[in-house]
Amino acid sequence: LVKPPYSYIALITMAILQSPQKKLTLSGICEFISNRFPYYREKFPAWQNSIRHNLSLNDCFVKIPREPGNPGKGNYWTLDPQSEDMFDNGSFLRRRKRFKR
């Protein structure tokens, strides 16, 4: 299997943008990636930490606490509205610029 040509930031962004409410938990993001890209099914445990690291490190991702009536584990993650144009014309291969809040 060949590794997809996308950065972790691009993979996370794809996952969030395809979700109906434009927000996902870490496990939802990882599920999207492994379902869409067979390469990550093989290497599952190792890259999950990289996803977690990128979510907390990059300003383009915003943590949203769960609502009181919504049980489950982990916070939701969404995109900062000002970062939605960080990929040129919807191409996830190249990021236009690093987003800073």
Swiss-Prot record:
DNA-binding annotation, residue ranges on this chain: 3-97
GO cellular component: chromatin; nucleus
Protein's GO biological process: anatomical structure morphogenesis; cell differentiation; cellular response to leukemia inhibitory factor; embryonic placenta development; in utero embryonic development; negative regulation of transcription by RNA polymerase II; positive regulation of transcription by RNA polymerase II; regulation of DNA-templated transcription
Bilayer-crossing regions: none
Compartment(s) of residence: Nucleus
CDD domains reported for this sequence: FH_FOXD3
Main location: nucleus
One Pfam family, short name: Forkhead
GO function terms (MF aspect): DNA binding; DNA-binding transcription factor activity; DNA-binding transcription factor activity, RNA polymerase II-specific; DNA-binding transcription repressor activity, RNA polymerase II-specific; double-stranded DNA binding; RNA polymerase II cis-regulatory region sequence-specific DNA binding; RNA polymerase II transcription regulatory region sequence-specific DNA binding; sequence-specific double-stranded DNA binding
Family matches, as SUPFAM superfamilies: Winged helix' DNA-binding domain
Cited InterPro entries: FH_FOXD3 (IPR047392), Fork_head_dom (IPR001766), FOX_domain-containing (IPR050211), TF_fork_head_CS_1 (IPR018122), TF_fork_head_CS_2 (IPR030456), WH-like_DNA-bd_sf (IPR036388), WH_DNA-bd_sf (IPR036390)
SMART domains cross-referenced by the UniProt entry: FH
Keywords: Activator, Developmental protein, DNA-binding, Nucleus, Repressor, Transcription, Transcription regulation
Transcription among keywords: yes
Keyword Cytoplasm carried by entry: no
Purpose of the protein: Binds to the consensus sequence 5'-A[AT]T[AG]TTTGTTT-3' and acts as a transcriptional repressor. Also acts as a transcriptional activator. Negatively regulates transcription of transcriptional repressor Rhit/Zfp13. Promotes development of neural crest cells from neural tube progenitors. Restricts neural progenitor cells to the neural crest lineage while suppressing interneuron differentiation. Required for maintenance of pluripotent cells in the pre-implantation and peri-implantation stages of embryogenesis.
Oligomer and partners: Interacts with POU5F1.
Listed name of the protein: Forkhead box protein D3
Organism: Rattus norvegicus
